[in-house]
Amino acid sequence: MSSSLGKEKDSKEKDPKVPSAKEREKEAKASGGFGKESKEKEPKTKGKDAKDGKKDSSAAQPGVAFSVDNTIKRPNPAPGTRKKSSNAEVIKELNKCREENSMRLDLSKRSIHILPSSIKELTQLTELYLYSNKLQSLPAEVGCLVNLMTLALSENSLTSLPDSLDNLKKLRMLDLRHNKLREIPSVVYRLDSLTTLYLRFNRITTVEKDIKNLSKLSMLSIRENKIKQLPAEIGELCNLITLDVAHNQLEHLPKEIGNCTQITNLDLQHNELLDLPDTIGNLSSLSRLGLRYNRLSAIPRSLAKCSALEELNLENNNISTLPESLLSSLVKLNSLTLARNCFQLYPVGGPSQFSTIYSLNMEHNRINKIPFGIFSRAKVLSKLNMKDNQLTSLPLDFGTWTSMVELNLATNQLTKIPEDVSGLVSLEVLILSNNLLKKLPHGLGNLRKLRELDLEENKLESLPNEIAYLKDLQKLVLTNNQLTTLPRGIGHLTNLTHLGLGENLLTHLPEEIGTLENLEELYLNDNPNLHSLPFELALCSKLSIMSIENCPLSHLPPQIVAGGPSFIIQFLKMQGPYRAMV
């Protein structure tokens, strides 16, 4: 029950145009980072007849899995399911487009198997959208569309492209995602005006040397294929800003990657990388580097020269240490993910290395101590995830972490929380589940901004009265402790929507629970000594989920208990002083 530590608006413009490289980079950055896997959204096109379509949402933890494919613009059909168009209907659309001299044609989601050859007559087209059909091939006549700048062919069953496409000298954006390509069609290498090329989710095994011909490319996405190596010629793509090769089978990168000095976003997550070339330090514009889920055991010192780096994700590798002073050299770094590695100690480099860090994720390592003063210069550190380490205590300057907003210390071996937790006045999320806590400090009541407090699976026997001061608290998880009672002050937590009290030793609930007017979920399961419920529970008008499994509740008729939460609430209303509410 822990919280994670760590919408684009559709635009409508009169004149449809392909987004510039700078715009795509900006949109890619806004779409998320490298920490979470994301599902690609339905691309959108600009145009006065564009309508809102469905969007897929993703899964981060801090630092978030960056997917550059989210930035394509293409038209959305009216809400509903895939259209089934007859050949006559498609021809009708083509005729209409010709008569109106339209520059943009959307035939997406029509279940088209074969594109009519009369498409060749639409030579005025600059944008053609054929995504989400059933095309296995394109007619050669598409090569007659010499003014085409955008061609969207994703989500079909294409295995090749006609050579006639090399007539498309103005083509800037080509989208071939989610097809059945086993190689990059040779004609693609001849489309030397391309600035954006999407090849995600095919069956491609190699990238040919001819990739060097696409020297104008600013965005190349070949993620989710079966590519084992990149050619040295990748280094000739000097205008490349975003390179997405995630989810392939790369073991090494060519040293020539260092020639792509304009790259700002480099996504290499989910490969088999064993090392990185020293030339990666030449990427002076690099702002986001995704390396999660590889086989790296070391990071080159040269990475320190990437002074523009803002986000670095190294989750799930075999790294036990970083080059000394690496982090302090990365003066713009704000998000660092080192989760699921082999760290036993904090990175060497002193307090200055965290001075710009906003989010630090060290989850699932072997760290047993947070050094005193390590965050003394971390004035903007807001999110710290130390879940699943071997901490037995917290540093003496713990109370000075005043900028902390989300703190996850779950699954450690903490036996107490220092009283000066009261200094963490900005804290909104505090996760302390699965530790060895027997009591809580009174200073906890000073965390007036706290929205979520998770204390599941500890050894708590009571709660301090000061918990009543946490009036912004929305989620309180106390499952699997040794509580016998709750303080009456619990009734002051009027913003509480979720209260987890299962697997304790509660004998009763205080009548003040009836003041929790926003409570929606109440978990009381597995309290073997809980024989009754207060009539005041009937006042919790928003309560929609109540778990009472394995509670004796002997003071209630068995048939009422068997009926579940709604029967119980109704019974409490009928039998208690609040029957007038029925």
Swiss-Prot record:
Residue ranges, annotated region (Disordered): 1-88
Variant or mutagenesis effect after changing R177A: Abolishes SMP complex formation
Motif (RVxF motif): 63-66
GO cellular component, one term: cytoplasm
Record's subcellular location: Cytoplasm; Nucleus
GO biological process: cellular response to growth hormone stimulus; cyclic-GMP-AMP transmembrane import across plasma membrane; fibroblast growth factor receptor signaling pathway; intracellular signal transduction; negative regulation of neural precursor cell proliferation; negative regulation of neuron differentiation; nerve growth factor signaling pathway; positive regulation of neuron differentiation
Comp. bias (Basic and acidic residues): 1-29, 36-57
Domain remark in the UniProt entry: Contains a N-terminal RVxF motif that is important for interaction with PP1c.
Pathological condition linked to this protein in its record: Noonan syndrome-like disorder with loose anagen hair 1: A syndrome characterized by Noonan dysmorphic features such as macrocephaly, high forehead, hypertelorism, palpebral ptosis, low-set and posteriorly rotated ears, short and webbed neck, pectus anomalies, in association with pluckable, sparse, thin and slow-growing hair.
Family named by the database record: Belongs to the SHOC2 family.
Official protein name in the record: Leucine-rich repeat protein SHOC-2
Species this protein is from: Homo sapiens
Upper lineage: Eukaryota, Metazoa, Chordata, Craniata, Vertebrata
Gene: SHOC2
